Amino acid sequence: AEVLLGSSDGGLVFEPSTFSVASGEKIVFKNNAGFPHNVVFDEDEIPAGVDASKISMSEEDLLNAPGETYAVTLTEKGTYSFYCAPHQGAGMVGKVTVN
């Protein structure tokens, strides 16, 4: 699965913002627009027993250039909420369901 960080017109969004993957399927988050973005999973909104720090970028770590990527593989089934730390206040949030 590929998720774009930022819309082509510069919007502060994940595209798609809600999606599903199979357990063990790689998710590639790809910076699309000219803003620094990152991917942080919300420790309160992921399946129990999953360590958010092991699947998240650091809040200070950013994908600065268009085309830069961050890949993660989720195996525990359930719903995971994530956000872009710099733009969470602007509504740059998403959700993935692992089936």
Swiss-Prot record:
Q: Which GO terms describe its cellular component?
A: chloroplast thylakoid membrane
Locations listed in the record: Plastid, Chloroplast thylakoid membrane
Q: Which family does it belong to?
A: Belongs to the plastocyanin family.
Residues annotated to bind Cu cation: H37, C84, H87, M92
Identify the keywords attached in UniProt to this record, alphabetized. Chloroplast, Copper, Electron transport, Membrane, Metal-binding, Plastid, Thylakoid, Transport
What's this protein's function?
Participates in electron transfer between P700 and the cytochrome b6-f complex in photosystem I.
Organism, by scientific name, is Lactuca sativa
> What InterPro entries does its record include?
BlueCu_1 (IPR000923), BlueCu_1_BS (IPR028871), Copper_blue_Plastocyanin (IPR001235), Cupredoxin (IPR008972), Plastocyanin (IPR002387)
Q: Which Pfam families match?
A: Copper-bind
The transmembrane segments are: none
Please state what the protein is called.
Plastocyanin
Lineage of producing organism: Eukaryota, Viridiplantae, Streptophyta, Embryophyta, Tracheophyta
Q: Which gene carries the instructions for this protein?
A: PETE
Membrane topology is:
Peripheral membrane protein
SUPFAM superfamilies reported in the protein's UniProt record: Cupredoxins
Specify the Plastocyanin-like domain's residue ranges. 1-99
